């Protein structure tokens, strides 16, 4: 008999980000092992974009209790700390129903960057949100330690990520007249992209793949950057494959799925030595971390692309599914 997993998320299923990508990529393995995945997301309700952070949708789920009862899931997972997550937490706690949660995004840091709200205010809220979860799944060992340092319990689990190797793989590359420096992701303030755009690196072409709330502003502000919009599947892989270095300037990501997509294509990564990169990059093998991004790029150019690819093989969506499945608890 097929077992039902219910995932409650404040992201729409067609959004392009690391959270949505993660759940989409474990679905085939869930189906293989006799599980089906249902979603409660803002698409079921009327919603508005969160100001300054339109990745998060604000929906009022007036019939969420009824929806959960109708789905009658065997397991429940709350993916995000938004409105839907809050309403689900309330219902599940009142009825003493088991569930687990995920910590995907460094919200305290992002909220401080976007709205100026002190982290001393948001960390207690995040800790409270996850306090009744049977297991808190987060991206890396360093994130586990950070959550513990903010008062989380011992039920935190490292939930690794993967990459679709049918799409993201090395290919024959053309010789670029200029160095191609690439970033892929949400075009927004908290991604720290201006450190990449402002960088005065010689004889290079900077390419930005992705959309976001700051896209129009950055197009005006940085005419030398080639903004190409959202790309998916083979078209996205082509940008990774043809880039000389993937530049990851973010200081607030818990992981950075785009880094391992780049590595799977053989493209080395240049990044700051912060959470996310320190857990993903094998320094001086798959990329270079340095407090000076230009220095990181210069050193990354000397790395062997075959070694970059070979080291990336450890990232597997099947392994990600196994960890997710192993931390499910019965909701009945």
What residue spans do the PLM features occupy?
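Conserved donor-binding/catalytic core segment of Leloir-type glycosyltransferases
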Residues: 8, 174-207
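Aromatic "clamp/platform" in nucleotide-sugar-dependent glycosyltransferases that forms part
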Residues: 251
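Nucleotide-sugar donor phosphate/pyrophosphate-binding loop at the beta->alpha transition
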Residues: 98-100, 109-128, 165
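A charged, aromatic-enriched C-terminal amphipathic alpha-helix characteristic of glycosyltransferases
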Residues: 302-331
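Short alpha-helical donor nucleotide-sugar binding micro-motif in glycosyltransferases
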Residues: 130, 230-231, 238-243, 324
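Nucleotide-activated donor-binding/catalytic signature segment of Leloir-type glycosyltransferases, i.e.
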Residues: 216-234
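Short hydrophobic beta-strand element within catalytic cores of glycosyltransferases
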Residues: 259, 268-271
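Donor nucleotide-sugar binding/catalytic pocket of nucleotide-sugar-dependent glycosyltransferases
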Residues: 124-170
């Amino acid at each position: 008999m097929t077992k039902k997993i219910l995932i409650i998320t404040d992201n729409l299923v067609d959004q392009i980000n690391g959270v949505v990508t993660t759940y989409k990529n474990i679905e085939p393995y869930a189906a293989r092992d006799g599980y089906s995945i249902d979603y409660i997301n803002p698409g079921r309700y009327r919603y508005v974009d969160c100001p300054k952070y339109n990745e998060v949708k604000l929906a009022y789920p007036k019939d969420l209790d009824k929806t959960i009862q109708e789905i009658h899931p065997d397991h429940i997972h709350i993916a995000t700390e938004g409105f839907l997550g809050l309403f689900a937490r309330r219902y599940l706690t009142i009825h003493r129903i088991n569930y687990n949660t995920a910590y995907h995004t460094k919200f305290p840091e992002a909220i401080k960057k976007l709205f100026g709200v002190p982290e001393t205010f948001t960390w207690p809220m995040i800790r409270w949100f996850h306090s009744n979860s049977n297991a808190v799944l987060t991206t890396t060992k360093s994130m586990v330690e950070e959550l513990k340092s903010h008062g989380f319990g011992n039920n935190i689990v490292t939930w690794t990520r993967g990459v679709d190797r049918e799409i993201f793989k090395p290919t024959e590359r053309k010789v670029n007249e200029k160095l191609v420096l690439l970033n892929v992701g949400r075009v927004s303030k908290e991604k720290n992209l201006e450190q990449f755009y402002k960088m005065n690196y010689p004889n290079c072409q900077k390419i930005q793949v992705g959309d976001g709330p700051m896209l129009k502003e950055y197009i005006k502000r940085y005419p030398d950057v080639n903004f190409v919009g959202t790309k998916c599947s083979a078209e996205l892989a082509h940008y990774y494959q043809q880039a000389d270095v993937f530049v990851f300037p973010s200081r607030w990501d818990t992981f950075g799925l785009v880094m391992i997509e780049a590595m799977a294509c053989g493209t080395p990564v240049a990044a700051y030595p912060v959470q996310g990169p320190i857990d993903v990059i094998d320094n001086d093998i798959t990329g270079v971390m340095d407090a000076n991004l230009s220095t990181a790029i210069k050193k990354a150019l000397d790395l062997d692309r075959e070694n970059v690819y070979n080291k990336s093989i450890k990232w597997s969506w099947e392994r990600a599914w196994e960890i997710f499945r192993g931390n499910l608890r019965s909701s009945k």
